[in-house]
């Protein structure tokens, strides 16, 4: 491609409304332009990268045996009502009514459509397993679209759906997709982790997220320093006691005593005013119970409640709803800053770390008073114990190997075992080998294709601009003929070299614009072309070309005859 024929709309200034690096650089590099809130036009440079991501995804999905289909973006309300998600999905669902007063939605996902297709096309277990995927535009009516294409309303997604006759088959399909995702993100050149995750609103059981590690990531990624264990913050667990220690509760050393604490409405104030170590305090949080009334959840004062773990408890109503102060006072007779387990007449569930505490402090369920020296089984019967908290840096890994570290991540892929959630709701059955109708077991597997582009930039950039991995750069090589408008020799050599490199399978941009070299170099750095070759009269006099990798600080002079092999060694396909 000739730069003179390419729309290169680079910007020197950073747009004021771009908050994160990927959004800033995609605008400055002329990859995207904003049309409206959460809606973006992909310009030629951006589209080249987007298509390369799509191609890698498509190749690996095909390699894994999935079949490509293309389903409508607009979906009839009847399917969503059948699955029960028409009302459940809420305002994220863009609802449309046609001229005949029929309700539709612009699909944010396609579980209903693919289930409808399969229940009409697949009749027998002999047609299984089957896996279908598409790469298609979705729409979610985000309240606050932000961060450019990272959290846009319209986006491109690869979504796949597997169908099996039994759990063993579903596990095989799931494992095949997991392996395909590992290959995809490795080929994309990303530093990522596959982490255990909660299924959330999708439903079902068994789930992994694929997180690109980046300081700007919205998600906390937890991984062990001594093993392959990794999970997101919602799913991550830790051993209840440090490595090498037996998880036993120390014997009581203190008597229970009631203390006036008139101004201690928070853990921090209690610790500051009364000298109690924070790890000897308890937070009592009250939530709505699944059978009505309130349920008390207890975590250590220096820990935070994990709301996903709490919501998954059978005793807790979903979605998780914290009790209001009015509800708490009506049930207990005290406010939120004075709650604790002693004489508390409601169901209690305590975190595993709380179960190991002795001589601790907590509210007395009387405004302005706390109990100190509380001990389980002496002062309060030991209630139900569960994993309720977020892990913290340095916690022992749940597999007993190493400790937990926390990094930031950007979710770019997610795989789920859905089970029969949709097939049961929508009566998608097949005949098994006994001739009995059984519901299909489903898996679903998504990759945010547009988000991958932004995540790659968040992980690969410097002060000069984007640093693309070779596999998804809009161009692998930039050829820069110096003074080509004056030197016929440089111009002819550049044209010949361009053709040779293109014939060798490289994706090449020849910068034939009538601009100063510094402007061309700055554009190429901003755009992120990973390899640059400069052709000049002085170099040709010595049968040399100037090479500079995007991450290199210095240039390298390469013999003209050896350039092809030199580039082949450096460019990762």
Curated annotation (Swiss-Prot):
EC top class named in words: ligase
Cysteine pairs bridged by disulfides in the record: none
EC number(s) given by UniProt: 6.1.1.15
Membrane spanning stretches: none
Alphabetical UniProt keywords: Aminoacyl-tRNA synthetase, ATP-binding, Cytoplasm, Ligase, Nucleotide-binding, Protein biosynthesis
Pfam families reported for this sequence: HGTP_anticodon (PF03129), tRNA-synt_2b (PF00587), tRNA_edit (PF04073)
Source species, domain of life: Bacteria
Compartments, record wording: Cytoplasm
GO molecular function terms listed in the Swiss-Prot or TrEMBL record: aminoacyl-tRNA deacylase activity; ATP binding; proline-tRNA ligase activity
BP terms from Gene Ontology: prolyl-tRNA aminoacylation
Gene Ontology cellular component list: cytosol
Reaction(s) this enzyme catalyzes, per UniProt: tRNA(Pro) + L-proline + ATP = L-prolyl-tRNA(Pro) + AMP + diphosphate
InterPro entries per UniProt: aa-tRNA-synt_IIb (IPR002314), aa-tRNA-synth_II (IPR006195), aa-tRNA-synth_II/BPL/LPL (IPR045864), Anticodon-bd (IPR004154), Anticodon-bd_dom_sf (IPR036621), Pro-tRNA-ligase_IIa (IPR002316), Pro-tRNA-synth_IIa_bac-type (IPR004500), Pro-tRNA-Synthase_IIa_type1 (IPR023717)
Role: Catalyzes the attachment of proline to tRNA(Pro) in a two-step reaction: proline is first activated by ATP to form Pro-AMP and then transferred to the acceptor end of tRNA(Pro). As ProRS can inadvertently accommodate and process non-cognate amino acids such as alanine and cysteine, to avoid such errors it has two additional distinct editing activities against alanine. One activity is designated as 'pretransfer' editing and involves the tRNA(Pro)-independent hydrolysis of activated Ala-AMP.
Subunit description: Homodimer.
Domain statement: Consists of three domains: the N-terminal catalytic domain, the editing domain and the C-terminal anticodon-binding domain.
Family: Belongs to the class-II aminoacyl-tRNA synthetase family. ProS type 1 subfamily.
Name of the featured protein: Proline--tRNA ligase
Species annotation: Chromohalobacter salexigens (strain ATCC BAA-138 / DSM 3043 / CIP 106854 / NCIMB 13768 / 1H11)
Classification of source organism: Bacteria, Pseudomonadati, Pseudomonadota, Gammaproteobacteria, Oceanospirillales
Gene name linked to the record: proS
């Amino acid at each position: 491609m000739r730069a003179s024929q390419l729309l290169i709309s680079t910007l020197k200034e950073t747009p004021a409304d771009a908050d994160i690096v990927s959004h800033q650089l995609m605008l400055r590099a002329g990859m995207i332009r904003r049309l409206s809130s959460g809606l973006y036009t992909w310009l030629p440079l951006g589209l080249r990268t987007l298509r390369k991501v799509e191609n890698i995804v498509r190749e690996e999905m095909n390699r894994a045996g999935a079949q490509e289909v293309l389903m409508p973006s607009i979906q009839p309300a009847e399917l969503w009502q059948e699955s029960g998600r028409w009302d459940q999905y809420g305002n994220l669902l863009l609802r449309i009514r046609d001229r005949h007063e029929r309700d539709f939605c612009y699909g944010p996902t396609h579980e209903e459509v693919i289930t409808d297709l399969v229940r009409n096309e697949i009749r027998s277990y002999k047609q299984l397993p089957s896996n279908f995927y598409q790469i298609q535009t979705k729409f979610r009516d985000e309240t606050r679209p932000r961060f450019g294409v990272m959290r846009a309303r319209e986006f491109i997604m690869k979504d796949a759906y597997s169908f099996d006759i039994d759990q063993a088959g579903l596990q095989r399909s799931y494992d095949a997709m997991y392996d395909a995702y590992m290959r995809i993100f490795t080929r994309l050149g990303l530093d990522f982790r596959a982490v255990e995750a909660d299924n959330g609103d999708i439903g079902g059981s068994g789930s992994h997220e694929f997180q690109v590690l980046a300081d700007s990531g919205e998600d906390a990624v937890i991984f062990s320093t001594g093993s392959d264990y990794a999970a997101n913050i919602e799913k991550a667990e830790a051993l209840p006691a440090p490595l090498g220690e037996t998880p036993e509760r120390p014997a009581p050393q203190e008597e229970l005593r009631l203390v006036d604490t008139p101004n201690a409405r928070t853990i921090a104030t209690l610790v500051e005013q009364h000298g109690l170590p924070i790890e000897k305090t308890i937070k009592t949080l009250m939530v709505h119970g699944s059978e009505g009334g309130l349920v008390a959840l207890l975590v250590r004062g220096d820990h935070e409640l994990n709301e996903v773990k709490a919501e998954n408890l059978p005793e807790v109503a979903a979605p998780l709803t914290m009790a209001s102060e009015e509800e708490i006072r009506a049930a207990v007779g005290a406010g939120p800053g004075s709650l604790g387990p002693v004489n508390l007449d409601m169901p209690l569930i305590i975190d595993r770390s709380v179960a190991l505490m002795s001589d601790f402090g907590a509210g007395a369920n009387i405004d302005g008073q706390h109990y100190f020296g509380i001990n389980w089984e002496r002062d309060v019967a030991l209630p139900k114990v569960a994993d309720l908290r977020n892990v913290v840096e340095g916690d022992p890994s749940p597999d007993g190997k190493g400790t937990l570290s926390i990094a930031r991540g950007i979710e770019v892929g997610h795989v789920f075992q859905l089970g029969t959630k949709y097939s049961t709701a929508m009566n998608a059955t097949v005949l098994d080998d006994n001739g009995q109708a059984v519901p299909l077991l489903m898996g679903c597997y998504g990759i945010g294709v547009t988000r991958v582009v932004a995540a790659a930039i968040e992980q690969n950039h410097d002060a000069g601009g984007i640093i693309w991995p070779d596999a998804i750069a809009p161009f692998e090589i930039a050829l820069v003929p110096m003074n080509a408008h004056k030197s016929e020799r440089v111009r002819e050599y550049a044209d010949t070299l361009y053709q040779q490199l293109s014939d060798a399978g490289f994706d090449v941009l020849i910068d034939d614009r009538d601009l100063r070299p510094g402007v061309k170099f700055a554009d190429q750095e901003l755009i992120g072309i990973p390899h640059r070759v400069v052709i000049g009269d002085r170099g040709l006099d010595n049968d040399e070309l100037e090479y500079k990798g995007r991450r290199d600080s210095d240039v390298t002079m390469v013999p003209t005859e050896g350039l092809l092999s030199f580039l082949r060694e450096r460019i990762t396909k």
